């Protein structure tokens, strides 16, 4: 992270991952523990919503967030095609168990395993050391992330093809084969809000799976080949010398997360194919309250939905707000990565204090 020339900088507890910047073992520990927290939140909130679910009322009127996600991918339906929550308890408890596994993994990496992967006795583990200004090291780690993302996309495509997902056009779960039309996929980059075909949705995921796995394999091996060094030369400005740092990579990550969150917010607020009305409620209107926000297009103040809002409203606004702050974090860390010291700004605004 940016130290402004201070070699003895220390970080307080609230500094988050800054304290593990150069300790890859502890970096993994924090991520494993964070994954455990996410799994626990998913499992516990699913059980909470299931305990409040009233089968005599439309799910979309009850202000749920977790149950609609499960229902939209075809989980919880009985053989007659009625959503009863079948299997949801098992899935929620599985998440709770996995949260303990991830938490234990975080503790192992924090207490037992080396704090830096370079100290590991396992040669394969040492490859995942953190050298923030080394593009070969960073591209190796990036490649493995892309492969895992691609496998997740491929798994979702196969789930829709074999098990089936919910199609609001027919009001039932059906098997969906992907439509790998590249012209359609290209067009949907800017016209995704109106997508009304599950085949097109799965086609996009299939394309992403191919692109991410292919790109991941390239990144995982390209940084260590003699061919690349021969064609591009050793580590220089063309390969990012002087550009990469922990702060810069954090800013890149926050920009990507922020963009995805904003896209998800608009998509959830308007699209009724991926986010069916039966589960999420009616599409939202855009409004300016204290800040730009999404508001329900119909009245949900019937005492059923929490705080009188639909699950669509909660989901869209949470993603929008999270995306906004992720962008602010991106700008903050990008400026710091470029060497800007925010203490200078304080001095300029209040010269007498300086």
Swiss-Prot record:
Induction: This transcript is too unstable to be able to determine its expression levels. The whole antenna complex is most highly expressed under low light; as the light levels increase antenna complex levels decrease. Thus at least in this strain the amount of antenna complex is controlled mostly at a post-transcriptional level. Transcription decreases upon iron starvation. The chain crosses the membrane at residues 27-47, 88-108, 140-160, 201-221, 248-268, 315-335. GO terms for cellular component: photosystem I; photosystem II; plasma membrane-derived thylakoid membrane. Keywords: Chlorophyll, Chromophore, Membrane, Photosynthesis, Photosystem I, Photosystem II, Thylakoid, Transmembrane, Transmembrane helix. Its main location: membrane. It is a multi-pass membrane protein. One of its GO terms (biological process) is photosynthetic electron transport chain. One of its GO terms (molecular function) is chlorophyll binding. The keyword Cell cycle does not apply. It is found in: Cellular thylakoid membrane. The keyword Ligase does not apply. Its cofactor is divinyl chlorophyll a; divinyl chlorophyll b. The antenna complex consists of divinyl chlorophylls (a and b) and divinyl chlorophyll a/b binding proteins and binds more divinyl chlorophyll b than does the antenna complex from high-light-adapted Prochlorococcus. Belongs to the PsbB/PsbC family. IsiA/Pcb subfamily. The antenna complex functions as a light receptor, it captures and delivers excitation energy to photosystems II and I. The Prochlorales pcb genes are not related to higher plant LHCs. This low-light-adapted strain contains 8 pcb genes. This is Divinyl chlorophyll a/b light-harvesting protein PcbF. It comes from Prochlorococcus marinus (strain SARG / CCMP1375 / SS120). The gene is pcbF.
């Amino acid at each position: 992270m940016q130290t402004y020339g201070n070699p003895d900088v220390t970080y307080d507890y609230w500094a988050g991952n800054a304290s593990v910047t150069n300790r890859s073992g502890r970096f993994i520990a924090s991520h494993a523990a964070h994954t455990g927290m996410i799994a626990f939140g998913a499992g516990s909130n699913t059980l909470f919503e299931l305990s409040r679910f009233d089968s005599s009322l439309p799910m979309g009127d009850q202000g749920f967030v977790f149950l609609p996600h499960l229902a939209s991918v075809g989980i919880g339906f009985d053989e007659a095609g009625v959503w009863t929550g079948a299997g949801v308890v098992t899935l929620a408890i599985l998440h709770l168990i996995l949260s303990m596994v991830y938490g234990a993994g975080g503790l192992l990496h924090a207490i037992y395993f080396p704090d830096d992967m370079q100290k590991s006795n396992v040669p394969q583990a040492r490859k995942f050391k953190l050298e923030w200004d080394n593009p070969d090291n960073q591209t190796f780690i990036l490649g493995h992330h892309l492969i895992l993302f691609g496998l997740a996309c491929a798994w979702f495509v196969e789930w829709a093809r074999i098990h089936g997902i919910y199609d609001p056009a027919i009001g039932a779960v059906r098997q969906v084969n992907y439509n790998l039309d590249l012209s359609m996929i290209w067009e949907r980059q800017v016209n995704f809000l109106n997508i009304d075909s599950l085949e097109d949705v799965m086609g996009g995921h299939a394309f992403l799976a191919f692109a991410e796995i292919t790109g991941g394999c390239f990144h995982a091996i390209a940084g260590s080949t003699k061919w690349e060094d021969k064609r591009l030369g050793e580590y220089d400005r063309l390969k990012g010398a002087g550009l990469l740092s922990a702060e810069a990579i954090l800013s890149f990550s926050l920009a990507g997360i922020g963009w995805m969150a904003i896209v998800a917010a608009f998509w959830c607020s308007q699209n009724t194919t991926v986010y069916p009305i039966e589960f999420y409620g009616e599409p939202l209107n855009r409004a300016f309250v204290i800040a730009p926000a999404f508001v329900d297009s119909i009245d949900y103040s019937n005492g059923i939905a929490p705080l009188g809002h639909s699950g669509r409203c909660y989901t869209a606004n949470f993603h929008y707000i999270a995306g906004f702050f992720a962008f602010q974090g991106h700008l903050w860390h990008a400026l710091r990565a470029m060497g800007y010291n925010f203490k200078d700004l304080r001095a300029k605004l209040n010269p007498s204090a300086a």
